[in-house]
Amino acid sequence: MSLIKPFRALRPAPGRAAEVLSPPYDVLSSAEAREHVKGKPWSFLHISKPEIDLDPAINPHDTAVYAKAAENLKRMVAEGVMVRDAQPCYYIYRLTWRGRSQTGLACVASLADYAKNRIRKHELTTPVKEDDRVRQIEAVNAQTGPVMNSYANAPEIDALLVQAAGGKPDVDVTADDGVRHQLWVVADPALIDKLSRAFNALPAIYIADGHHRSAAAARVATARKGEGSHSFFLSVIFPEREMTILDYNRVLKDLNGRTPDQLLAELVKSFTVTPSAEPVHPASAHEYGMYLAGRWYKLAIRPGLVPGDPMGRLPITVLTRKVIEPLFGIKDPRTDKRIDFIGGARGPDGLAARVDSGEMAVAFALYPTQMGDLMAVADADRIMPPKSTWFEPKLADGMVNHVLD
């Protein structure tokens, strides 16, 4: 079976993308989504977060919510806002943000290869989030949020993507957050064949963002059985060298019974600790910023304390094993209410604000996980700690959708 193949995307009608494209469903709360769609009747949030069209008190996992998603999608198709391509195509999807671009292939990827670990994972999923995506797929009979994937060094593929994006884009929209989204439809059979051959020769691709969506697609395929469109999941695959991972930082509610001075005394056993007059932006993998009692510190792990294996040398693994677990007693960051996570887009001021408000007691700034490290962990069939990666920019919901025939 092929690793990827073209598909007939359901997507905004010509000239309608600016009305439709929305942030991914999981980056906005229901309240934020309600605010976002004011004056935007065709925003894809009406499908990806349909509770915004119901009583604010409703449980977002109520059956009525998923029924509303199906109703809203049918209305968008009936009104001609969304149309489906007549023949299977590939789509070149380019994201441009802060002067950098990444260009990938929108396609559908094999769930058989996902099961065989040719499509590699690095993150655990939670049943509640998986269940939500399963119910969403079943309700609308489509996969409506692409999984962001990556491939390792492949110059032939890079050249093909550039070739396919050589003309005027079919979609060119700049979103409210400043991210430019461009799409080129690839309908030429010869170019489709070249892209298929090149991608299908890859030994592996790597899930970057979208583990719950891919896991949900796999569950739907298992339930439906047999072969069909449900045997593939909606994907956009980018070259590893173009991917941008921001830091994903930690804030903790208390010092686990210690005073600030006592915490510093514990930290010097594993780190050199240097006060800083400025916010600390870690410059290397095992350098950390810490904001404690109104002051920034630079922490650098002492020589010989970093393991050599792909998992052990991750910045978050070192912090977890040397600080979060032994000093704060946090064994499962996914469930412990004393820890929270802040994406790097908020910057060091966002960390300091959480501490200065009194809500949190200490903040740790981390060096971003690198794509090479992510791939090495996935190749070793290991699972990274929760909230290890924050990818920016993110794919828009609504650009391409995979209908399950």
Residue positions per predicted region:
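Surface-exposed, charge/polar-rich loops and edge strands
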Residues: 1-405
